[in-house]
Each structure stands twice: as structure tokens, then as C-alpha cells.
């Protein structure tokens, strides 16, 4: 019996640390130490032939939905097997710091700035004990891809600046009447800039966010704004550490969050979700010929069973796979708010119909 138990233990350890060669959406995903990867709401940076996955480090229970550790980093050469690189951005024990323990840091994304040979991280930032009222975005930098990252600041973007797609008529609008939330009159007012005007002086709200670097090196910050009712796409400066003041509103009063953006054959696509808290809902697909142009709604990109809840997940990032022309991976989170650390990852290949429209189908297991 002792021999059998020894063999079983050896087999289980061997299995735990065995090399992965496929994606298994929703399954436990062990790192090189056999521990479930802890990088929620994350994104990928491909640098010098290595993939770096940055995400929220969650802890046990509901309290784990607040940030108690920081932003975790993992590295991989093949996207299947990941090495724990530790905490890239640590939160502070200083109770006077905006990024103190117990604040909220969500959806961290990292891009590389060639001009300064510097890695730049942006994230959604909420202040400790303030719920989701602050709606700020934070930025941190490092000379080393895996960190440590130094937090620079957190802001409400584009203070004192109108969106470039606002007409003179919209800028001149006056909202004096108290409107009932979700009434048709209220929705019309939102489309006309009700919340843009409200937040004009202090800066706009920035919650769920993504980053995108275009072919010409221009970087953009995409975020849910205006009480999660409207998306904003903001241009970043040449250092990627601040806003230029050029931004547009997208899908006003559309109630989108969890943006993820990619480009194929000169056309931009964005996948978002609706706003139902931690609960999943149907994904939304939009497209545009210019990132700062007019975005058109296409519909739900998901097909098959549970398409109406995005296979029980929410988008976080879309990865263009280097060396695989036209290959994109849809990355999403399956949240477990009652035990945050147990959140799972849903990675699926983006497919394209004959007209070039992206779509998703569930796969229990797949490889590229």
C-alpha cells in the first residue's frame, strides 16, 4: 500500500508540473510552481520573444476583490506554460498613499515605449473606502518589463477639454432640469453630453480600460466613462504617460464596459460587455475604419450555447499572436466574486466569417 501511495503522489506531482500544450478555458491553470495563475482582468505584452501577462492579484474571499497585494506578472515562451515573475506593481503600506492597501486596481495593461526604452502600465484605480466613485486611471513605469513599476499618478482624464467629436451645439447645451434616470429624456441628455459637461472641470471618469498601440506607434487609452454609459478613446502622448487632450466618445448611452480592441486588414474592432456587475452578459462587437472615427455596432460576436453570457465570462484583452498572421486570441475572465482568487480564464480563438466579421465559438480545449 505504501508503494502505491508513493506512486500516486509522484504521478500527481508530475501531472501538476507537466508541460501544457493546449488551452482549457475555465480550468485551473497552474504556473511553474503548480499554483493557479493569479492575473485577473489582465493583458499581454510580447517583448523580445517572450509573452508577459499582467493582471490583478486576487486574494481569498470577497475582500480579495479589493487590492491587497498589487499587479502580478507571469512570463511565457508559448502562451501555454507560465513562469511566476512576482508582483510587478506593489501597493503601498503608507495610509496616505492613493495606492494604499485596500484600494482597487483593476484591468492593468502594459505597453512598451520605444522612444524612452520604458514599460508603461495603466490601470483603473479606485480609492480605498470610496467604492467606485473616484473612477480614476493610474500610470506606472519601469525600465524592466517584469518590474518593479513605479506609480506616477492617478487622474481623471482630459479635464477642461471637449471630445473632438462634439459639435459646437453639444458644447453649448445646458442641462438644468432634473431628469429621471433611464427615461428617454435622460438617455437623450446623456448622448448630448450630460456627464461630459458635469465632469468637464475635474476630468472625465475612467473605469474599465484597455490600451492599444497602433502601427504608427500612437498609443490610445480606451475606457468606460460617464457612469459607465459611454466609452472614451483618448490619445496618449509620445511617452505614453499622459493624455494629449484629444479624445472621442463612443456609443453614448450604450452602457458598455470591459473594452478590448484589435485591428485586422485595416479595420478596427472592439469587443465590450454590458454592465451587470460581476455577472456575465452578452458581448458586443463594434467596428471602425479609424480608431478616432465613427464606431458602428455589429452585434454579439458569440455563437452557440451560453452565447448570451459570453460563455460565462467578460472580455479583458485581445492578443494578436506574433508570427501567426491574422491570429487573435480573445481573453476573458470568469469572475468568482465570493472567492476572488478562484477566478478562471477563458481564452478562445477569434474566427472570421467570409465577410471578415469576427466571431467566437466555445471550445473545451484547443491549441494554435
Predicted features along the sequence, with ranges:
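Carbohydrate-active catalytic/glycan-binding domains of CAZyme proteins
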Residues: 18-368
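Bacterial Sec-dependent N-terminal signal peptides
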Residues: 1-20
Amino acid at each position: 500500500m505504501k508503494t502505491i501511495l508513493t506512486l500516486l503522489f509522484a504521478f500527481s506531482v508530475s501531472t501538476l508540473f507537466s508541460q501544457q500544450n493546449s488551452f482549457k478555458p475555465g480550468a485551473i491553470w497552474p504556473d511553474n510552481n503548480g499554483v493557479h495563475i493569479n492575473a485577473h482582468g489582465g493583458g499581454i505584452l510580447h517583448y523580445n520573444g517572450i509573452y508577459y501577462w499582467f493582471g490583478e492579484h486576487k486574494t481569498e474571499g470577497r475582500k480579495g476583490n479589493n487590492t491587497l497585494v498589487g499587479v502580478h506578472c507571469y512570463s511565457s515562451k508559448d502562451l501555454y506554460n507560465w513562469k511566476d515573475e512576482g508582483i510587478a506593481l506593489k501597493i503601498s503600506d503608507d495610509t496616505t498613499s492613493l495606492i494604499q492597501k485596500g484600494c482597487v486596481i483593476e484591468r492593468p495593461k502594459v505597453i512598451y515605449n520605444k522612444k524612452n526604452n520604458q514599460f508603461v502600465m495603466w490601470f483603473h484605480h479606485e480609492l480605498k473606502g470610496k467604492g467606485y466613485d473616484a473612477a480614476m486611471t493610474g500610470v506606472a513605469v519601469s525600465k524592466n518589463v517584469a518590474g518593479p513599476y513605479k506609480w506616477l499618478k492617478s487622474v481623471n482624464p482630459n479635464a477642461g477639454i471637449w471630445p473632438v467629436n462634439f459639435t459646437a451645439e453639444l458644447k453649448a447645451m445646458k442641462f438644468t432640469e432634473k431628469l429621471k434616470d433611464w427615461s428617454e429624456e435622460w438617455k437623450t441628455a446623456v448622448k448630448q453630453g450630460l456627464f461630459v459637461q458635469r465632469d468637464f472641470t475635474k476630468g472625465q471618469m475612467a473605469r474599465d480600460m484597455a490600451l492599444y498601440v497602433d502601427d504608427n506607434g500612437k498609443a490610445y487609452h480606451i475606457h468606460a466613462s460617464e457612469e459607465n454609459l459611454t466609452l472614451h478613446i483618448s490619445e496618449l502622448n509620445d511617452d505614453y504617460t499622459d493624455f494629449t487632450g484629444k479624445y472621442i466618445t463612443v456609443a453614448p448611452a450604450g452602457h458598455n464596459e470591459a473594452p478590448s480592441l484589435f485591428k485586422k486588414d485595416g479595420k478596427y474592432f472592439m469587443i465590450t460587455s454590458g454592465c451587470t456587475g460581476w455577472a456575465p452578459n452578452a458581448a458586443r462587437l463594434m467596428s471602425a475604419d479609424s480608431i478616432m472615427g465613427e464606431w458602428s455596432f455589429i452585434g454579439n460576436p458569440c455563437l452557440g450555447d451560453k452565447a448570451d453570457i459570453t460563455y460565462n465570462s467578460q472580455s479583458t484583452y485581445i492578443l494578436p499572436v506574433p508570427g501567426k498572421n491574422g491570429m487573435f486570441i480573445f481573453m476573458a475572465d470568469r469572475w468568482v466574486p465570493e472567492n476572488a482568487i478562484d477566478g478562471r480564464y477563458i481564452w478562445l480563438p477569434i474566427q472570421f466569417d467570409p465577410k471578415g466579421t469576427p466571431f467566437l465559438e466555445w471550445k473545451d480545449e484547443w491549441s494554435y
